[in-house]
Regions:
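Conserved Ser/Thr-centered positions that define the repeating blades of beta-propeller domains
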Residues: 1, 66-67, 136, 140, ...
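Surface-exposed loop and turn segments in beta-propeller and other repeat-based domains
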Residues: 4-37, 76-109, 146-156, 203-206, ...
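Conserved beta-propeller blade signature
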Residues: 54-57, 124-127, 134, 173-176, ...
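Short glycine/acidic-enriched loop and turn motifs that connect beta-strands
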Residues: 62-65, 132-134, 179-184, 228-230, ...
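Blade-level signature of beta-propeller repeat domains, shared across WD40, Kelch, NHL, RCC1
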Residues: 257-302
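Glycine-centered coil/turn sites that cap beta-strands in beta-rich domains
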Residues: 297-340
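Glycine-centered tight-turn motifs at strand-turn-strand junctions
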Residues: 348-377, 389-391
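C-terminal tail/sorting-segment detector
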Residues: 381-401
Length: 401
C-alpha cells in the first residue's frame, strides 16, 4: 500500500574486485566476474515476480540479480544470461567450462551481461541489456530458460533501456526503447507475438530524436524525448506528431525540450503529467499547460537560477538555439518589475521588462543570454539590478559561454 517501505542493501558480489567467483545455478557451477564499485554496480530497474515471490534487479556491471522477498535472509543471487554469442541459455545444459558471466566489453566479456531494464509477467521475464533483450521462461523450480534477441534477430538497436507493455484485447504489444549508442537518435522496436517477430519504427530516429520513455494515455502512445513529447494514435505507433506545449495560465514556460517521463492521471478529465529537466508540468487533454511545478527555496528578494548560467549547455534550460536563466524576486503585491543587466565595466547589456507571476508571492523574468543586438554575451560576471516600486535590488550572475 506504500505506507511502509523495506530497505535491502545494493547487490554486491563477495570476492576480490576484478577477480572471479563461482556460483550455483540449479545444480551447475558457473563463473562470474566480481564488481564492487557502486558506480559500475548501479541498479537501473526492478521487477517483481509475484507468483514465485522474487524481486529482480538490473545492475549494469553487477549483472542481473534476484532475491526471494518471503525468505527471511533476503540474499541476492546472480542470474545468468546468455553470452553475446549465445542464442539461448537452457537450465541444466550450460557448458560450465565455456560459460563466463562477465560484463566487461568484448572481446573479454559480453554486452549482454550489462542489464538495464526488466519486466516480469506471469511465467515470462524480459531483460534488456547493452547487447539486446532476453526472454526468459520460468520453470516450476524457479530456474529460467533464456532466448536472446539482438539487431541480427530484428531489433532496431541492441541497447535496450526500456521495456513497456501495451495491452490490447487479444494480445500484448511489447515496446522496446532500443538505443544504438548512448545519447544518440535511435529507432523503437516492438513485438506483437512474444518475440517471434519484431517491428522497427524509424520515424523518430530519422528526425534525430532520442526517446527516454514510452507511456499511454486514453487515446495516444506518448514518447518522452529530447525534442519534447511526441504522440501516436493508441492503435498505431508508426506515425508520430509533436505535442505542442503552451505557456501555463500565468505565462510561465518550461525552458527545456528534454522530457523524461509522461504519465496520464485523472478520471473525468485526463491530465498528462510531464517530468522535465525544468520541473513538473501538467497538461490538459486539449494540450493546454495548467501548471508548472518546481522546487526551490523562496526568493530572497532577488536571485538568479541557474547560477552560473551555462549559456550553451545542451539539454538544460535550452529551447531551440538559446539557453535561459530565470531571475526570481519576491513580489507579493504584484508590482511590475524591470531588470537592467550590466557587464563588469558597468555598461548596460540589456533591459528586461517581461515579468510573469509564478505564485502568490514571487515573479520571474527570463533572459536568453543575449544583448540588445541579439548576440550572446561573453563569459564573465554580470551585475543585475531589479527596479521594483522605486526600489533597487542587486544580484550577480556568472555567465559561461
Amino acid at each position: 500500500d506504500g505506507l511502509s517501505w523495506h530497505y535491502i542493501q545494493q547487490p554486491v558480489d563477495e570476492g576480490v574486485p576484478g577477480g572471479d567467483i563461482n556460483f550455483d545455478w540449479f545444480g551447475q557451477t558457473l563463473k562470474k566476474k566480481v564488481w564492487h564499485t557502486t558506480v559500475d554496480n548501479v541498479s537501473y530497474d526492478v521487477a517483481v515476480d509475484i507468483k514465485r515471490k522474487y524481486i529482480y534487479s538490473t545492475n549494469w556491471g553487477g549483472g542481473l540479480t534476484r532475491f526471494n522477498y518471503e525468505n527471511g535472509s533476503k540474499q541476492w543471487e546472480p542470474v545468468p544470461l546468455p553470452m553475446d554469442d549465445q542464442d539461448s541459455l537452457i537450465c541444466g545444459e550450460i557448458d560450465e567450462e565455456e560459460y563466463y558471466f562477465n560484463p566487461i566489453d568484448p572481446p573479454d566479456g559480453s554486452y549482454n551481461h550489462k542489464p538495464f531494464s526488466v519486466y516480469a509477467v506471469a511465467d515470462t521475464i524480459w531483460v534488456g541489456t547493452a547487447g539486446g533483450i532476453n526472454k526468459g521462461i520460468f520453470r516450476s523450480d524457479g530456474c529460467i530458460n533464456w532466448t536472446h534477441y539482438n539487431m541480427e534477430k530484428g531489433l532496431g538497436g541492441d541497447w535496450v533501456i526500456g521495456i513497456i507493455p501495451q495491452q490490447f484485447d487479444e494480445y500484448t504489444r511489447l515496446w522496446l526503447i532500443s538505443w544504438i549508442s548512448p545519447n544518440a537518435p535511435h529507432p523503437l522496436t516492438y513485438t506483437n507475438d512474444g518475440g517471434q517477430t519484431w517491428k522497427v519504427v524509424n520515424q523518430l530516429f530519422n528526425q534525430g530524436i532520442i526517446v527516454y520513455n514510452l507511456s499511454f494515455s486514453r487515446d495516444y502512445i506518448l514518447a518522452s524525448t529530447d525534442h519534447g513529447v511526441y504522440f501516436s494514435d493508441i492503435n498505431d505507433g508508426i506515425f508520430w506528431m509533436k505535442m505542442p506545449i503552451t505557456s501555463d495560465q500565468t505565462g510561465e514556460k518550461i525552458l527545456t525540450e528534454n522530457i523524461y517521463s509522461a504519465i496520464s492521471i485523472g478520471n473525468a478529465e485526463e491530465i498528462i503529467m510531464l517530468g522535465t529537466a525544468d520541473g513538473l508540468s501538467l497538461i490538459s487533454s486539449d494540450r493546454v499547460t495548467l501548471d508548472n511545478i518546481r522546487f526551490w527555496e523562496p526568493a530572497s528578494l532577488f536571485s538568479a537560477y541557474p547560477n552560473p548560467f551555462f549559456i550553451n549547455h545542451e539539454g538544460y534550460n535550452q529551447v531551440g538555439n538559446d539557453g535561459y536563466v530565470r531571475f526570481l524576486y519576491s513580489n507579493p503585491n504584484y508590482f511590475s518589475g524591470l531588470i537592467d543587466i550590466f557587464d563588469f565595466a558597468m555598461d548596460r547589456v540589456i533591459q528586461l521588462n517581461n515579468p510573469q507571476s509564478i505564485n502568490n508571492y514571487e515573479s520571474e523574468i527570463i533572459w536568453n543570454g543575449r544583448n540588445e543586438s541579439g548576440d550572446k554575451v561573453a563569459n564573465g560576471v554580470y551585475f543585475c539590478r531589479l527596479s521594483l516600486k522605486n526600489q533597487y535590488y542587486w544580484t550577480k550572475l556568472a555567465v559561461i559561454n
